[in-house]
Amino acid sequence: MEGLLHYINPAHAISLLSALNEERLKGQLCDVLLIVGDQKFRAHKNVLAASSEYFQSLFTNKENESQTVFQLDFCEPDAFDNVLNYIYSSSLFVEKSSLAAVQELGYSLGISFLTNIVSKTPQAPFPTCPNRKKVFVEDDENSSQKRSVIVCQSRNEAQGKTVSQNQPDVSHTSRPSPSIAVKANTNKPHVPKPIEPLHNLSLTEKSWPKDSSVVYAKSLEHSGSLDDPNRISLVKRNAVLPSKPLQDREAMDDKPGVSGQLPKGKALELALKRPRPPVLSVCSSSETPYLLKETNKGNGQGEDRNLLYYSKLGLVIPSSGSGSGNQSIDRSGPLVKSLLRRSLSMDSQVPVYSPSIDLKSSQGSSSVSSDAPGNVLCALSQKSSLKDCSEKTALDDRPQVLQPHRLRSFSASQSTDREGASPVTEVRIKTEPSSPLSDPSDIIRVTVGDAATTAAASSSSVTRDLSLKTEDDQKDMSRLPAKRRFQADRRLPFKKLKVNEHGSPVSEDNFEEGSSPTLLDADFPDSDLNKDEFGELEGTRPNKKFKCKHCLKIFRSTAGLHRHVNMYHNPEKPYACDICHKRFHTNFKVWTHCQTQHGIVKNPSPASSSHAVLDEKFQRKLIDIVREREIKKALIIKLRRGKPGFQGQSSSQAQQVIKRNLRSRAKGAYICTYCGKAYRFLSQFKQHIKMHPGEKPLGVNKVAKPKEHAPLASPVENKEVYQCRLCNAKLSSLLEQGSHERLCRNAAVCPYCSLRFFSPELKQEHESKCEYKKLTCLECMRTFKSSFSIWRHQVEVHNQNNMAPTENFSLPVLDHNGDVTGSSRPQSQPEPNKVNHIVTTKDDNVFSDSSEQVNFDSEDSSCLPEDLSLSKQLKIQVKEEPVEEAEEEAPEASTAPKEAGPSKEASLWPCEKCGKMFTVHKQLERHQELLCSVKPFICHVCNKAFRTNFRLWSHFQSHMSQASEESAHKESEVCPVPTNSPSPPPLPPPPPLPKIQPLEPDSPTGLSENPTPATEKLFVPQESDTLFYHAPPLSAITFKRQFMCKLCHRTFKTAFSLWSHEQTHN
């Protein structure tokens, strides 16, 4: 193993991504076209799929394998351009006002970094650009606010230079060079448009493979000096370059082949085609290079030179004429300049923002050590303009270090000087009016993989001096258009960056900044200045409304509109549930679907397996959003239902009381003699009596509420002449009559479809034909959209196909021949015209002595919930009835006669599974659904118990690998089938097994006395060979859903529907 050599190229990944980005920008080797709005984006499927869960799921779908054009209608082109630049560069430039849209798009695309972008810290504090604001305050007033890029900039030769010295520079074009050095200078003080400095290019003799460092030099700025036209931008690739006097550097710059050469465009193109070392990964939206001409008009000396330049290159130094500063090196990784769809070129380095970066001539300056190859120097392109030279201050010349082996085509060193000294300089500006104005304070730079390892530059005294003028900052900010100011999204925390106002002991206008960017972050916390600006601007921000073009819903922000369109109007549903294969718009919906439908807490979607799961904080946030949405929906429904009755809350309460009493109609109640309302609890009844002013109630006693509304609604006769127009009740006053009529009107409301009728008789007539009655749970009066939904609700909430025995009481042994049922059948059907009879609640009957019997009014069965838990004692006989009376069947008593009168308090609600008693029915429902320790659904393979059948079904998927023959064999061993009774469920405890009977009376002897319809018989063969036992729900038989799935026991109306459903289990 000693002969093995290991080499690592840390820049390979950056170079690879950079090359891919170049291909994307040029449209080469791209295999997918994304259409967003009115713009088209070319990209590579592999890159998109590796970065986004959405694209991974979209491209891996077999239906989309051959498709190369995709239209994304859930995002805006600007936001998608920012995200695409981030994918190809790992860096992001985004305005504060667009941060919410980028976050939403990152969430929709499944990019975790962008989803949590708000919690990330930007790289550099950009809101403060005091020197620029101070210098260009007058120009901001007069300028046309257009974005500009300098594409051709003049160059002044040194005073000692001659034309003969410059000729070798021009003639030296035959040798292609790795990089080009351009000395550029702008001394024109009053350009009416804000300009961005030129990218200065450097040409060196040094070859790329050498280990060397690049010295980055900023130009000199001398205030008040009219005869200092020379600005030096020097890029040297020596390992160590000590600082030299200005004269020495000018002499060195004059030498041919060092840095003063400006080759022709052809030589530049050759240089561009030569193999280059790895480059940093940056992004640009410009695809076509521009060949521009540079003209020098200084001191009577001019030259025409061709310069290959990318016009939309974003690498510029922010201009500043006042103050001087030293620039530290940002080693935080590659940076993307994506500023309103204006991006960086692939071939340039990006220096960090600085108002001025100057070359300091010092005789005894220490040498600068070389940088690590993984570092990068970055700069931000900023809006800049000129100001009068009297505003300028003295400058310092400082050396700057640039990293080696980072440039692909040419080395970019920037020089921007704003002097009013030499007006002979000519500057050509290429204006881009299509790009809106963007202030640097609206920009946040975020880079993945921050590495603040900048100790290499600590040997040199690298500082930055910023002249701060807070009043100018406020003045400059106030001149910006309102739409370009802070547009903070109310839903997101606002990350404010501070203007550093504390001064150093030497000067209160300057502060020292170390080489580490973390020091920058520490120096820019929130400031009172920005807080005041933000508060003022947010207060004056107009309330814009954004309308969905599909459903015309209105949203406060574009982020909310994007989320709504993505969730509800996106035709593509890339995320699928692994269990039932239902498709959803977002991965989060798959997650919540699996929790609610399959009882699986973890998201089983394969799209999320390749990426990190969202952090807990974000998951809690999403859960809160869903919970808040459900609460709002419930409140809206409550308010809508409460509008016709009492105003505000009282009508909603009254309607809830009506529904609650409709549910307990067969139970004992306190009946109001004024309006006929019945209450189970005395406290509720007393509270209701207070709503009837006048006499105290007469004849209040604990009786059962009869079936018919009219006899109940007739109050005690009195001498007053005020009569209710709905129920002919006579009332004592006009006010009492109005209150009573409102109560009567609410009482005549259909509990299934909420239709209101003039009289209770009309409502009762409608109830028997109401189409929503079949889909209404008679236990809690909830209405569902499908029969499967109500069946699932009855099973999971009310346990109506309960199979577990209860230890608190003993169940009588049922006669399998049907003798008990036949003998008790006539007693269980009293006369239909009987109005008042004593009824005991189903719960009391369950816990009462086995010799007692429950009497039900057959016509009032619609008010009695279908409680299949009565099957523990009662034999259920189901018969075919007409469609409009499909729900009219009721469980009938099968035990011995019961003593008349209630034997237990009706205020106790027992759990049929564990026997625990509750005083409030809501507590019982919550206990049965979530907290009950008895789990009646047993897996026959591992004998594991579950609270609901859906959790059992989800668990059973783990056993699907076993052969179905083995499963059937196990089931036959666990539960042998008797000859005279249907197969009992495979419950682990053997003693209770004979006590539990299935719902369908499919016993051979029982069928002779009590013939069952064909719908019941169809369940028998499917139940006998099922993988795990479930009693068929009574609602399924009633709804004529004759075909049951053996795995999940969902019922279907046709065999084809069952077959289609079974394909989802394969």
Swiss-Prot record:
Keyword Repeat: yes
Residue ranges occupied by any BTB domain in the UniProt entry: 30-96
Signal peptide: none
Pfam families: BTB, zf-C2H2, zf_C2H2_6
Origin: domain of life: Eukaryota
Covalent cross-link Glycyl lysine isopeptide (Lys-Gly) (interchain with G-Cter in SUMO1), where: K40, K879
Tissue: Ubiquitous in fetal and adult tissues.
Region (Disordered): 154-196, 388-442, 454-485, 498-525, 806-840, 879-906, 963-1014
GO biological process, one term: regulation of transcription by RNA polymerase II
Biased composition (Polar residues): 154-177, 820-831
Single GO molecular function: POZ domain binding
Subcellular location as annotated: Nucleus
Subunit record text: Homodimer. Interacts with ZBTB14.
Record-given protein name: Zinc finger and BTB domain-containing protein 21
